[in-house]
């Protein structure tokens, strides 16, 4: 009798010893192979299923050992995409799951000069984890704008942005460039990164800005018109000269690009008489005197440093008019109205025959 009890106890102890050994072995690294594997945990996945999936992926030695560990562990598993390898212990994997150490991807995004902030919102939302509407809502969020203005980080942002007649306060202030953004970047972080680039670019022309007699808002507004009207540096400087002269002469700028923006149409759309006469604070085609000698209320697109420099280094010419060949993009400049009308007629005839 005693002998049987001893044998039974011995067997139990042996089983416990072997089980403990198996458990410890099962929670060890499966291999020294450090090749990364993407492992996805969907919302609502059970711990038992996670152990099974890890075993099927060849990442752990024992599904049973991990199943037992997860059963007693108080870890709160978070859904997401994780980067794992067989060289990790199951405990290290579970620690990743419980801390939410998910894999963050990044996206390379190019934002082009001359595009509107609504275009930027579309491009960004296609690649990042926020919607176009969320980005535009952030751009228009007065509390966020005030935090930027008062932060001391962006001295070029002033209360001029808070004019409620401006469609999008940060239009013209987000520098066009190629950026690397994390997938989970917020609209706020993206905007701040772009403003950092704007600050860097403006630092190249600090002295010219100081001596210009213009506010940053005026410079960027004028630069946005130049950006849309000209392609070459030489033409940009001449276009800037024309606009400054028209302001000095108390004339309307008469720029179609401002009308397109003011009525929410894209370049190339047909502008109607109603569009040309629309009384919005961007429309420099108004001829009733309300826009004489005035810039639009704010920028109509986001601008390159080339257009900013053109505004600060306008040419020494004395042109009052310009017209572009819509077929070739070439811009022609004139000093008087009759010369301008003749060139318009000539170009219309040329484009009609091509």
Give the residues covered by each predicted segment.
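Generic cytosolic/nucleocytoplasmic N-terminal low-complexity/intrinsically disordered segments
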Residues: 1-2, 342
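A broad, low-specificity signal for short, low-complexity segments enriched in glycine/proline
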Residues: 2, 41-46, 280-283, 292
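N-terminal type II signal-anchor transmembrane helix
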Residues: 2-36
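Hydrophobic alpha-helical segments
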Residues: 5-7, 18, 48, 237, ...
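Short N-terminal secondary-structure initiator segments
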Residues: 12-19, 34-48, 115, 148-149, ...
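Signal peptide-directed extracytoplasmic domains
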Residues: 26-198
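Bacterial extracytoplasmic/cell-wall-associated proteins, especially those involved in peptidoglycan
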Residues: 118, 122, 126-129, 144-354
């Amino acid at each position: 009798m005693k002998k049987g009890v001893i044998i039974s106890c011995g067997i139990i102890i042996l089983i416990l010893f072997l089980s403990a050994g198996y458990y410890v072995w099962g929670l060890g690294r499966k291999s020294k192979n450090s090749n990364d594997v993407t492992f996805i945990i969907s919302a609502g996945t059970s711990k038992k299923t996670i152990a099974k999936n890890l075993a099927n992926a060849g990442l752990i030695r024992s599904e049973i050992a991990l199943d037992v560990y997860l059963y007693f562990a108080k870890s709160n598993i978070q859904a997401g995409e994780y980067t794992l390898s067989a060289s990790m212990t199951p405990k290290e994997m579970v620690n990743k799951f419980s801390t939410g150490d998910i894999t963050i991807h990044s996206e390379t995004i190019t934002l082009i000069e001359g595009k509107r902030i609504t275009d930027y919102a579309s491009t960004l939302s296609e690649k990042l984890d926020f919607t176009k509407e969320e980005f535009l809502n952030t751009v228009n969020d007065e509390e966020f704008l005030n935090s930027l203005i008062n932060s001391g980080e962006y001295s070029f942002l002033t209360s001029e942005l808070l004019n409620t007649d401006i469609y999008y306060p940060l239009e013209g202030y987000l520098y066009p460039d190629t950026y690397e953004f994390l997938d989970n970047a917020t609209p706020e972080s993206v905007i701040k990164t772009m403003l950092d680039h704007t600050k860097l670019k403006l630092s190249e022309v600090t002295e010219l800005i100081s001596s210009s007699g213009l506010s940053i808002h005026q410079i960027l507004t004028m630069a946005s018109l130049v950006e849309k009207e000209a392609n070459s540096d030489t033409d940009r400087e001449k276009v800037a000269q024309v606009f400054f002269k028209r302001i000095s002469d108390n004339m309307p700028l008469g720029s179609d690009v401002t009308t397109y923006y003011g009525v929410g149409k894209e370049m190339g759309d047909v502008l109607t008489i109603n569009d040309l006469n629309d009384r919005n604070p961007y429309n420099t085609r108004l001829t009733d005197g309300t826009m004489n000698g005035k810039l639009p209320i704010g920028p109509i697109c986001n601008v390159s440093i080339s257009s900013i420099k053109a505004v600060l280094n306008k040419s020494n010419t004395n042109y009052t008019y310009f017209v572009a060949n819509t077929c070739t993009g070439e811009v022609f400049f004139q000093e008087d109205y009759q010369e301008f009308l003749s060139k318009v007629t000539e170009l219309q005839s040329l484009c009609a025959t091509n």
